[in-house]
Design a protein with these regions (language model features):
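Ligand-binding clefts of soluble mixed alpha/beta catalytic domains
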Residues: 1-530
Length: 530
């Protein structure tokens, strides 16, 4: 295959000519997409791949890899079009001064399709990230495999997947979906730690609407099938729905601020002034829990009161809203938050909530981030739909995640902690280090109404006034069992505290656990109930 012809007017036999030729080639690499293709990209409200990379990284920090790489294929006339870069921008730079590897697929060149050289460039930057111990951020905007290059495209996809797996739990991996991502291409983002999508711009699916209509007869739009809203609210594939591309890039930067560069590093710390006295803001929690156990409250209020500056970066916000997960800081140090949300399905655990929380706990554990758990859970959601879809196996994932975690685990029971859900939500029995309860906590096998109906069924049937008798027995049950004190007597909770003391108690607990060392039995790997 012949080299690129020398531009007219450049004498490459002189040093000046060689430098001029280099500048020409580099300029072509930076403008690989045609003006028409770039204009179409901008008309859709989308940046080009290079614009995205430069917007994401610190100014002047980008170091590009393989800028002059070109494909080697001669099939179907490809030899007549060999743009520099081959449709993907790769390299490394910094975000807030910390090293980050990045690749961005360029839809203006071959529709961002993945061929041999394209794939090799991504593999190289992933290898660099793993070797140097820095996060890798992938910006996806691609038409899929480059059909003209045949099976070699599929081979490079698998090479990328393998590296996603090998890097899992070693370096943070974040995928930004900023356009189409279809077919086999979706599996690389699915293997990463966080997937971010852009509203009305991003689409992910294995098979598109046309194929689905042909095979099943279903009619569905791109947005309904695999849009950002669908994957954030229904499938749970995505962790954030951005309003536009800049919002997506900013959320990725925010995520990185909570994550260490790799599993051997500690998360970044921001120095703050320690406050170990109870403040007026802390005292607001003393009146948060309603007198009625059936009245909801917003768990975000509790979360905000214990975090620095009430800053909480929630992930997976629209999926399984009955459980809340996200990142914050306590004394400038990152923590992961897992909390039941009484405002949604009364905070019950279902399949989606269990898997959402399990994944988050395991992510925190992989990257040395302590987990704070706030518990108000009446149990697992009942119903044939849950049972037939595998709540036993899939709910066990959350139990597994807590039991295998070796990072500091601090649990606060604010109200209900019933049945198996009490065990699953970061209980002392699964290995939590510090377990606290508010005086409003109700720790029991089940709620008072259900317990009374089972324990006193005959007495209620024989009573002349079953409603009054049931009310009396419910009160007796609540006074006797539905409280935190039996658990405290047995050491299942380490202390019953005023709600206003929560922040200070968490600060003290995390300080004490800062040098925690825990080991698990040697094994190749566990067999999580997938």
């Amino acid at each position: 295959m012949s080299a690129e012809p020398v531009a007219t007017g450049i004498d490459i036999h002189t040093t000046a000519g060689k430098l001029a030729d280099l500048e020409r080639r580099l300029d072509e690499a930076k403008h690989a997409g045609s003006e028409r293709a770039v204009a179409r990209q901008h008309a859709k409200g989308k940046m080009t791949a290079r614009e995205r990379v430069l917007s994401f990284l610190d100014d002047g920090s980008f170091v590009e890899f393989d800028e002059l790489a070109r494909h080697r294929s001669s099939s179907f006339g490809l030899e007549r079009e060999r743009p520099y870069g081959d449709g993907v921008v790769t390299g490394h730079g910094t975000v807030d001064g910390r090293p980050v590897a990045v690749f961005a697929q360029d839809f203006t060149v071959f529709g961002g399709s993945l061929g041999e050289v394209f794939g090799e460039k991504i593999v190289k930057v992933m290898d660099h990230a793993l070797k140097t111990g820095c996060p890798v951020v992938g910006i996806n905007d691609s038409g899929g495999a480059r059909i003209q290059e045949g099976v070699v495209s599929l081979g490079l996809y698998a090479e990328i997947f393998k590296r996603n797996v090998h890097a899992s739990g070693v370096i943070p991996q974040i995928s930004l979906i900023m356009g189409p991502c279809a077919g086999g291409a979706v599996y690389s983002p699915a293997l990463t730690d966080f997937v971010l999508m852009v509203s009305e711009k991003s689409h992910m699916f294995i098979t598109g609407p046309d194929v689905i209509k042909t095979v099943t007869g279903e009619e569905v739009t791109f947005e309904e099938l695999g849009g950002a809203h669908t994957h954030n609210s229904r499938s749970g594939v995505a962790h954030y729905e951005a309003s536009d591309e800049e919002d997506c890039l900013e959320f990725a930067r925010a995520l990185l601020s909570y994550l260490p560069s790799n599993n051997l590093d500690e998360p970044p710390v921001f120095e703050t002034e320690p406050v170990l006295s109870v403040t007026d803001a802390d005292r607001e929690l003393d009146t948060l829990i309603p007198d009625s156990a059936n009245q909801p409250y917003d768990m975000h209020t509790v979360i905000g009161h214990v975090l620095d500056d009430e800053e909480f970066l929630e992930v997976h916000a629209r999926f399984a809203p009955n459980i809340v997960v996200g990142f914050g800081r306590v004394e400038g140090r990152p923590v992961g938050i897992v909390a039941n949300q009484p405002m949604s399905f009364a905070g019950t655990l279902d399949i989606a909530a269990s898997e959402k929380a399990a994944r988050f706990v395991r992510t925190c554990d992989a990257f040395n981030i302590p987990v704070l758990t706030f518990v108000d859970v009446p149990g697992f959601l009942p119903g044939t739909d849950q049972e037939w879809n595998g709540i036993i196996r899939r709910g066990a994932k959350l139990l597994y995640a807590y039991a295998e975690a070796t990072v500091p685990l601090v649990t606060v029971i604010t109200r209900k902690a019933y049945g198996g859900a009490y065990d699953v939500m970061g209980s002392k029995h699964l290995g939590a280090d510090v377990n606290l309860a508010w005086p409003t906590a109700q720790i029991a096998v089940m709620g008072a109404q259900g317990a009374v109906n089972i324990l006193y069924r005959r007495e209620l049937m024989a009573s002349g006034d079953p409603d009054a008798e049931r009310a009396r027995l419910v009160t007796e049950y609540e006074d006797t069992l539905a409280n935190p004190y039996l658990a405290a007597e047995r050491g299942y909770v380490d202390a019953v505290i005023r709600p206003s003391d929560t922040r200070v108690q968490i600060v003290r607990a995390l300080r004490a656990l800062r040098n925690k060392r825990a080991t698990l039995p040697p094994k190749k790997h566990g067999n999580i109930p997938l």
